[in-house]
Each structure stands twice: as C-alpha cells, then as structure tokens.
C-alpha cells in the first residue's frame, strides 16, 4: 500500500486529463529512486487504500473531493502578503474590493485588472471596464491590481517548495528572455512558509525588469512540462498544506 495515492481526474477517453497525465510515470520514477512504493495513482477509488489520497485535476474536481470530505473549496492565492513588496510587483494591489469601490480606485490609480479574490477561476482576469462588470458575481470580493504599463517579453512559471526553486518553465514568449535569477530566488525565499506553490513571473519588454504576476497553490496547477519526483512530492505537500489550512480555519470558527 503506498503512502500517497493520487486520485487522477479522468477524461472521456478514459485517460487522465492533461493536468494529471504526468503523474503515473513521475510516481514510478519517484518509487524507483526511493526503492519503495511511496506513491501510487488511480482513476477510481475501487477498494484501494492509502494513508493519504490526493485529488489531481481541475479546480472543480478538487473542490468536489473537498466537499465529499466535508471541507470548503480552495481559496485564491493571487499575491501572498509576503510578496507584496514594490521591488517584486512594480504596481499597487488591493485586496477584498467590492464592485462599488472600483470607480474610485480607477480614478486614483488608473487602469485596473480584476481577479476573483476568494474563489480561483470563478471568472477569468478582466480589465476594469463597465461593460464587463456584469461577468463578475456580485458576492465575489475582488483582487485588484494596477495594470503594468509595459508589455511582457516573456512569462514563466516558477515551481517553489518551501522557499526553494524546484523548476521553471516558460508559458509565453514574445522574446526569449529569462527572468532575473536573483530576483526570482528572493521572491521564492519570501514564500518559504508555503509548502508548495507556483509563482508566475514576467519579464517586461521595456527595461527587462522581472515582476511577480500571481501565485497558485500547487493543486489543480498547470505544469508546462514540469514532472518527476519533485513534482509528485510538491503535489503531496501542497495537499497536506491545504488540509492543515482548512483544519485551522475550522478551529478558528469554533
């Protein structure tokens, strides 16, 4: 019996969805290196057991599993407070903003980008335009950021485990420009209290500055080619961290 069993979301063709596809071979590699069966994968829980079951797939898939456990949904990470430093962001950000506050912020700080403040992917990031506000649920507090004035030359996803960079993958390229390594490692170090996450950074076309775009829990997270033993260990750690967060939240409301 493995310590960790990854419950993979299946596609209609019977194969794992793209988010989960790297897990079987990555688990095999991790087990081979450890010379023991630490990780397993399944598309269905049919009598299989493990110390910990970790769902892998879309946000909806993971939230459904959390609901079956009697827990709440995942929360949006956006920019963790530790990362809220001008040297990393190059812009102002605002948390827990209601739709009624947007006009005032727009008048004072210029063009704005709006994201869900609590529920990841409840709607896609959109610019602040009156005609688009109807797409935002009235009960969703917003994460708002100033628009970065420069275009992006490149965007990268940095995989961070307890403050250490495990891997980095490009996901948008106007020009092949890698981010400033020292800046990225400094960003990662500020996030050392998080067991595992993905940090998106951009290299600005004008001036080449490296800035943080947003963070994601390493759950229901696009991998862009990241795989192997580090990946499965991070997925385990992120899930256990989510369970601890939810337990702490429940205890705080008793």
Annotate each predicted stretch with a short phrase:
Residues 171-174, 216-225:
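Glycine-rich phosphate/pyrophosphate-binding beta-alpha loops
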Residues 157-160, 208-221:
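A short beta-strand motif that forms the metal-chelation/ATP-contact edge
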Residues 2-26, 30-187:
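Active-site nucleotide/adenylate-binding loops and adjacent lid/helix of ATP-dependent enzymes
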Residues 118, 148, 203-205, 217-219:
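Short, flexible loop/turn elements at secondary-structure junctions
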Residues 146, 166-212, 230-251:
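A long amphipathic alpha-helix within ATP-dependent nucleotide-binding catalytic cores
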Residues 58, 227-228:
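Short, solvent-exposed helix-helix connector turns and helix-capping sites enriched
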Residues 129, 228-230:
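Hydrophobic alpha-helical segments
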